Amino acid sequence: MKIVADENIPFVNELFEPIGEILLRPGREITPADVKNADILLVRSVTPVNAALLEGSKVQFVGTCTIGTDHLDKAYLDERDIAYSSAPGCNAGGVVQYALSAMAVLGLLQDSPSKDFKVAVVGCGNVGSRVYRTLSALGYDCIGVDPFLDTSTIPHLQPFEAIYDCDLICCHTPLTRSGPAPTEHMFNTDVFNHLKSGATLLNAGRGGVIDNRALLQYLNTHNDLTVVLDVWESEPDILVELLDAVALGSTHIAGYSYEGRINGSLMIHRALIDYLLAHGEHPEDTRRAIEAYVAKDKETINVTSFADAVLATYDVRDDDALLRQAVQGLPASFDMLRKQYRKRREFSHYQIEAAPPKLMPLLQSLGYGVVAK
């Protein structure tokens, strides 16, 4: 069995070598010639999977180690009877960490949030709902915006226009161009003009959900909107002038925690195992060894405030600085920063040795451990 895989998929050899012969390629450079004789294709969001790539190939299973699937031509895959699977929610913990870090840097993360501070989470799927639940549990007044859900899933569900009264808007939607509620350029000049003065807009979903040129034009003529962008239109060839105009920018790494990336690999491995079992194969399952390896090490920290606890695990300013320093090398440096991304650990990796007692329940609810006395 032949497998073509993105070289940046964590533990790709350890997980998939027992299943078949692996050819590793840079994600943006996977070609029809690479996949012509492959049975399995494993990708990330940087690889468009469509007729141009797969026509004439033997591929029968496509796995993407990402939550999003807008890079997969699902209609073509269905027509060709090619099975496919994604990793919904795999990086939710990392995205929560990213959002809280940005809030801490901007002075929006408080031990006791003001009741006058209102948050909107736009897109409440696997990741957005985790952000919504986390901020709500931390005491923030949160609303959810998602036309495909009802209040049984998100209690305070509101129409899109409700974001105009919010102080922080966190965007976690997929990119869609058709259907009953397309998200492409959902945030445009008209929306910017209606946002609350002094609001903060954070996008860790898909770049095209925000009209980047319209946003740049707005920021060049207004000083009442703070913007945090982890995702951009036309990645990796991003609008450099927009980077100059936003408060914080990064290279599509919000969910790029060590645990999140490994979760994506493990979920696709499980999906492939299930597919092969259903087709009479009996592949070796190596997930347990990987899971045990990830879980065994912990790091101890001391904190004095909630913001301090978050920034001790991850400071988004580090990634912002790396992107700004690499701006002359764009677009290649955008991908290089992602490829060489450090081992960023989620809250569950850390154990609190000392912290104000009132913070301990809050920190434990986020997954921090506590050093036994």
Swiss-Prot record:
It catalyses: 4-phospho-D-erythronate + NAD(+) = (R)-3-hydroxy-2-oxo-4-phosphooxybutanoate + NADH + H(+). Pathway: Cofactor biosynthesis; pyridoxine 5'-phosphate biosynthesis; pyridoxine 5'-phosphate from D-erythrose 4-phosphate: step 2/5. Its EC number is 1.1.1.290. GO terms for cellular component: cytosol. Substrate binds at residues 45, 66, 256. Pfam families: 2-Hacid_dh, 2-Hacid_dh_C, DUF3410. GO terms for biological process: 'de novo' pyridoxal 5'-phosphate biosynthetic process; pyridoxine biosynthetic process. It is found in: Cytoplasm. Its main location: cytoplasm. GO terms for molecular function: 4-phosphoerythronate dehydrogenase activity; NAD binding; protein dimerization activity. Catalyzes the oxidation of erythronate-4-phosphate to 3-hydroxy-2-oxo-4-phosphonooxybutanoate. This is Erythronate-4-phosphate dehydrogenase. It comes from Saccharophagus degradans (strain 2-40 / ATCC 43961 / DSM 17024). The lineage of its organism: Bacteria, Pseudomonadati, Pseudomonadota, Gammaproteobacteria, Cellvibrionales.
